[in-house]
């Protein structure tokens, strides 16, 4: 491809021209089963009629004005998200990083209003919250931060799924104002949190007057079989961030606030040029409509359970397999060794996946995936994994 592009991606040697459903076609008209969905973005697959119509109609009418004016599509999407989540207010942006940046700013401003001029946020090891400096500082990855110091201060990282560690961190640092975590770590290797842990963190935050901030950028919008993954624990955060699947491929992010976090920001506290524009919000409304009308929450739960069970059965007892894990259509297969080459081999076999944390095969197929298509994933992927492990003995 063009040498004018910045060299920041290790791209696979394929270009796609069009897609339909869970399928993509390359420049040579070869078909691929897309089990990655643009890293969890294309939740309705490709070429979804309702989404295409909403984008086309809105683009023909109006693409952009400004947040200095009323934006009806933005207000409508905010209402829908508030209804689905039980949250009170929504701030739109353009990406997950921006949504998490807004959450970090809100937590600090929340502390500032209480007289805490150096608010601290507790985050988790192996977490991922974005590539801006503040979200990198919050992210539990030394590798991602390497070379970009000095990092913003005010972040305390503790082991994931470890409630006593969070409690101890708060006792050691009296300036803590918030806890930021993922219900299901994506870049961290598809690591689910314990439901008891989530409920315990919710209770601890309430007791200590901290904000519970949940990053649902990858796990939200139906991916686990509920609108938001934290709903499996029957809790409500004070702050939630969304992006990826929210508009089915059109760039968007959102930060939702409730309880003590609602009303913290005022005019001038934060802002965005493009966030919550008419086009992105029209797409977001179409995504929510499609998920509701097509029963995609149930589909993600049921087909995801089928895919999980099939992979676990086929890989049971295979030397080198650590675990098949995840929830809904957010699944990971952990191997005992680095396996990045599997993304290339799967692509060569007509299946799109990726590998995170060096040794976890990640699957994030569209929510429209059928049982038959899930079986196709298994038929392609399992032999590739077995062959790879046998060659590495």
Swiss-Prot record:
One GO BP annotation of this record: L-arginine biosynthetic process
Principal subcellular localisation of the protein: cytoplasm
Sites where the protein binds N(2)-acetyl-L-ornithine: 131, 272
One protein family per Pfam: Aminotran_3
Sorted UniProt keywords: Amino-acid biosynthesis, Aminotransferase, Arginine biosynthesis, Cytoplasm, Pyridoxal phosphate, Transferase
Tree of life domain: Bacteria
Keyword Amino-acid biosynthesis: yes
Keyword tRNA-binding: no
Pathway this chain belongs to: Amino-acid biosynthesis; L-arginine biosynthesis; N(2)-acetyl-L-ornithine from L-glutamate: step 4/4
Subcellular location: Cytoplasm
Residues bound to pyridoxal 5'-phosphate: 215-218, 273
Family: Belongs to the class-III pyridoxal-phosphate-dependent aminotransferase family. ArgD subfamily.
Subunit note: Homodimer.
Protein name: Acetylornithine aminotransferase 1
Source organism: Bordetella parapertussis (strain 12822 / ATCC BAA-587 / NCTC 13253)
Gene for this chain: argD1
């Amino acid at each position: 491809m063009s040498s004018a592009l910045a060299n920041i991606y290790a791209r696979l040697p394929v270009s796609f021209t069009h897609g339909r459903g869970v399928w993509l076609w390359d420049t040579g008209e070869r078909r691929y089963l897309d089990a990655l969905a643009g890293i969890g973005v294309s939740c309705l697959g490709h070429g979804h009629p309702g989404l295409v119509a909403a984008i086309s109609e809105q683009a023909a009418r109006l693409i952009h004005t400004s947040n200095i004016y009323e934006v009806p599509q933005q207000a409508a999407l905010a209402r829908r998200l508030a209804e689905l989540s039980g949250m009170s207010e929504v701030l739109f942006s353009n990406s997950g990083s921006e949504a998490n940046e807004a959450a970090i700013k809100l937590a600090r401003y929340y502390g500032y209003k209480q007289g805490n001029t150096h608010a601290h946020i507790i985050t988790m090891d192996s977490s991922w919250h974005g590539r801006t400096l503040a979200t990198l500082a919050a992210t539990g990855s030394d590798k991602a931060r390497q070379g970009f110091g000095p990092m913003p201060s005010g972040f305390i990282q503790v082991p994931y799924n470890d409630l006593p560690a969070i409690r101890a961190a708060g006792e050691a640092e009296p300036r803590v104002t918030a806890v930021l975590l993922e219900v299901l770590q994506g870049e961290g290797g598809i690591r689910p949190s314990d439901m008891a842990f989530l409920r315990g963190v919710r209770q601890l935050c309430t007791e200590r007057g901290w904000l519970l901030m949940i990053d649902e950028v990858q796990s939200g919008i139906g991916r686990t079989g509920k609108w938001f993954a934290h709903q499996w624990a029957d809790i409500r955060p004070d702050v939630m961030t969304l992006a990826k699947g929210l508009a089915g491929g059109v760039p968007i992010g959102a930060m939702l606030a409730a309880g003590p976090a609602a009303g913290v920001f005022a005019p001038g506290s934060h802002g965005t040029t493009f966030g919550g524009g008419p086009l992105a919000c029209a797409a977001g409304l179409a995504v929510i409509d499609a998920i509701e009308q097509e029963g995609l929450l149930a589909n993600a739960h049921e087909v995801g359970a089928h895919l999980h069970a099939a992979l676990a059965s086929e890989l049971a007892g295979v030397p080198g397999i650590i675990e098949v894990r995840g929830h809904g259509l957010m699944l990971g297969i952990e191997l005992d060794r680095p396996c990045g080459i599997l993304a290339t081999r799967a692509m060569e076999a007509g299946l799109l996946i990726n590998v995170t944390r060096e040794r976890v095969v990640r699957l994030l197929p569209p929510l429209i995936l059928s049982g038959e298509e899930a079986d196709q994933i298994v038929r392609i992927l399992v032999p590739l994994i077995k062959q790879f492990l046998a060659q590495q003995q």
